[in-house]
Amino acid sequence: MDLASLRAQQIELASSVIREDRLDKDPPDLIAGADVGFEQGGEVTRAAMVLLKYPSLELVEYKVARIATTMPYIPGFLSFREYPALLAAWEMLSQKPDLVFVDGHGISHPRRLGVASHFGLMVDVPTIGVAKKRLCGKFEPLSSEPGALAPLMDKGEQLAWVWRSKARCNPLFIATGHRVSVDSALAWVQRCMKGYRLPEPTRWADAVASERPAFVRYTANQP
């Protein structure tokens, strides 16, 4: 594995990421959520993509793609491992969203190219990174109150907002993916909350990918 070449690709791709608002439709009609996991000891990459109506946040479509994993897990290069399955799930959708929430980092990455940025750039769709753990940068400690907020900074640059979406839960790291500003990324995530730690798009993507009870109940009620 030529990590020097992959690192150079990341730096080059990151230079093309658009960090300002360029939504084709604002407000969007459809928002997608995307989540990636692995099966069979990492040999299979599984990507779930869901479509929700906005502003009702009603689930209208979901797809799950499973493909052979083409790259081992290497910290800092996860997007190269996850992107092929995300693309496969994206191509399965019967209609394309105006905005995509990706479970993972956007520009809040050492080389400013997390999976949300990588995917958004490659398919040219506005994306937001919604990550559960910090990958780089520093932030001031948050209060325990829901709604507590702090910028994630690295080398004098704001990479994300660190936001405690729910009491007694760890904060989310909300970043520009592509074609969405960091402030708008936070605003869109806040508009898509329904009382859980995660916004509805990535909450549903996680539920579909992992066949969690919410998704099992949903499918049981479908005609």
Curated annotation (Swiss-Prot):
PANTHER family in the cross-refs: ENDONUCLEASE V
The reaction(s) this protein catalyses: Endonucleolytic cleavage at apurinic or apyrimidinic sites to products with a 5'-phosphate
Protein name: Endonuclease V
Functional summary from the UniProt entry: DNA repair enzyme involved in the repair of deaminated bases. Selectively cleaves double-stranded DNA at the second phosphodiester bond 3' to a deoxyinosine leaving behind the intact lesion on the nicked DNA.
EC numbers: 3.1.21.7
A biological process from GO: DNA repair
Recorded family membership: Belongs to the endonuclease V family.
Domain of life the protein comes from: Bacteria
UniProt keyword annotation of Cytoplasm present: yes
Entry GO CC: cytoplasm
Cofactor: Mg(2+)
Residues reported in the UniProt entry to bind Mg(2+): D35, D103
Originating species: Escherichia coli O139:H28 (strain E24377A / ETEC)
Signal peptide: none
Entries under NCBIfam families matching the protein: PRK11617.1 (NF008629)
Keywords noted in UniProt: Cytoplasm, DNA damage, DNA repair, Endonuclease, Hydrolase, Magnesium, Metal-binding, Nuclease
One MF annotation (Gene Ontology) recorded for this entry: deoxyribonuclease V activity
Primary subcellular site in the record, as a coarse category: cytoplasm
Record's subcellular location: Cytoplasm
Marked site: Interaction with target DNA: Y73
Gene designation: nfi
